[in-house]
Amino acid sequence: DGDIPMEPSFDGEKIVIFLSKSDFADYKILKLHEGVRGPLTTTLVLPVLVEALHILKEESDGMDDNRRWVRALARRIERLGLATESQPLLLAQKLLELPVKRALSSARMLAEVSS
């Protein structure tokens, strides 16, 4: 299984993130720890969501797409009044409620506990 990068798949009804076996084993352990959950989400979900938003942008508004994730993401953007956002990275951060800020806060708390 070795060292392979994570790879998202956007072809199905849901977005799937594939990890190597060792990365997935680490993920299963780490996701249970509150202090690590924020940075973990930022590391895995944010880049994949940015890529999904690029796909959504290229394929217009997504409402005619038959993939459930495309329709759900387009509806959520519209519902939050973010449909006109032009930068996928900024939009992804808004959709995930500032994950970098939360990840930094979690990491700071872990560092303070460790000190």
Where are these regions (language model features)?
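Bergerat-fold GHKL/Histidine-kinase-like ATPase
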Residues: 1-115
